[in-house]
Amino acid sequence: MARVCKVTGKRPMSGNNVSHANNKTKRRFLPNLQSRRFWVESENRWVRLRVSNAALRTIDKVGIDVVLADLRARGEA
């Protein structure tokens, strides 16, 4: 399963670990993904999404119906 948020599209990015001696080694910054179930009142069912914490805030703000409509418009749900 890819580490990609279904709503925001956030995915891992690369960067460096930097030691006190300023040595640099490559690392990955992973998105804060959560598997959550959302109750969709209009469809009277649960929807399971793997979303980032930022997407959870978006869903709280605009509502799950708006987010699902956007996903369906993009052809992802």
From Swiss-Prot:
Q: Which GO terms describe its cellular component?
A: cytosolic large ribosomal subunit
UniProt-recorded Gene Ontology molecular function terms: structural constituent of ribosome
- Gene Ontology BP term (one): translation
UniProt cross-references to Pfam families, sorted A to Z: Ribosomal_L28
Cross-referenced InterPro entries: Ribosomal_bL28 (IPR026569), Ribosomal_bL28/bL31-like_sf (IPR034704), Ribosomal_bL28_bact-type (IPR001383), Ribosomal_bL28_sf (IPR037147)
Matching HAMAP family: Ribosomal_bL28 (MF_00373)
Per the record, the similarity remark reads:
Belongs to the bacterial ribosomal protein bL28 family.
UniProt protein name: Large ribosomal subunit protein bL28
Source organism of this protein record:
Neisseria meningitidis serogroup B (strain ATCC BAA-335 / MC58)
Task: Cite the source lineage.
Answer: Bacteria, Pseudomonadati, Pseudomonadota, Betaproteobacteria, Neisseriales
User: Gene of origin?
Assistant: rpmB
